[in-house]
Amino acid sequence: MQSFLNKLIPLALTVGTGLSLAQSSMYTVDGGQRAVIFDRISGVKEKSVGEGTHFIMPWLQKPIIFDIRSSPRNIKSDTGSKDLQTVSVTVRVLFRPDVEHLPSIFSKLGLDYDERILPSLGNEVLKSVVAQYDATELITQREVVSKEIRESLMKRAKEFNLLLDDVSITHLSFSQDFTNAIEHKQVAQQEAERSKYIVMKNEQEKKANIIRAEGEAEAAKLIGQAMGNSAAFIELRRIEAYKDITESLSKSKQVTYVPTSGNLLMNLNKQ
């Protein structure tokens, strides 16, 4: 029995050692990842390794796993505008490493390449672009500013083998004094527009009254001319007046109209 145990122990140690070596000689690269191989003798290998299970030489080689999917990051910078206003701007970037240059990225920057590059790079670009615009231009030309920041950041990041899939301004604010000044200016503009509207309205009403008065005066003038120049019109007005008098007399109970040649009116109810 003791002899059997003495033989079993070395065998178990051999098998265990073999399994350990086999396990340490294998590694897996998941989806959305790449591996860079570091060799203790030759250094970082020039080619990155794709997805799947791969073999390495235990102890001599070590896989460094990179996530190559796009990752978000916010970059904030407090800077100054062209007219010396304090500006706080934050941009959101979606970044990923250039797969073709992973060995170089690891050799020069390491796994935390984004932490080493993006904050300083973003701060540099934001200060440079914002300084070209006045505070009001940063508001009114936000799309232009955002485009310039995006193009500049992408260009600079590419120098470090970083790819930016998207860059957008998420926050843009100014000092409290400038904000208050903008609000006061907007209120003043609204009041000016309101006053302008009231003046225009009064002017229109004044013009309308003048036109109406001129029209009425012209109409009265034309009527006067017609009355003075038209005998038929005068005769018509005389007949209408005579008709009104006749109708008024016919309704009176104390007056009788006698159609004689003298057109006499006689009071029949003399007291």
Curated annotation (Swiss-Prot):
It is found in: Mitochondrion inner membrane. The keyword Electron transport does not apply. Residues 1-24 form a transit peptide. InterPro entries: Band_7, Band_7/SPFH_dom_sf, Prohibitin. The keyword Phosphoprotein does not apply. Its main location: mitochondrion. Keywords: Coiled coil, Membrane, Mitochondrion, Mitochondrion inner membrane, Transit peptide. GO terms for biological process: mitochondrion organization. It is a peripheral membrane protein. CDD domains: SPFH_prohibitin (cd03401). Residues 201-221 form a coiled coil. One of its GO terms (cellular component) is mitochondrion. Pfam families: Band_7. Belongs to the prohibitin family. Prohibitin probably acts as a holdase/unfoldase for the stabilization of newly synthesized mitochondrial proteins. This is Prohibitin-1, mitochondrial. It comes from Dictyostelium discoideum. The lineage of its organism: Eukaryota, Amoebozoa, Evosea, Eumycetozoa, Dictyostelia. The gene is phbA.
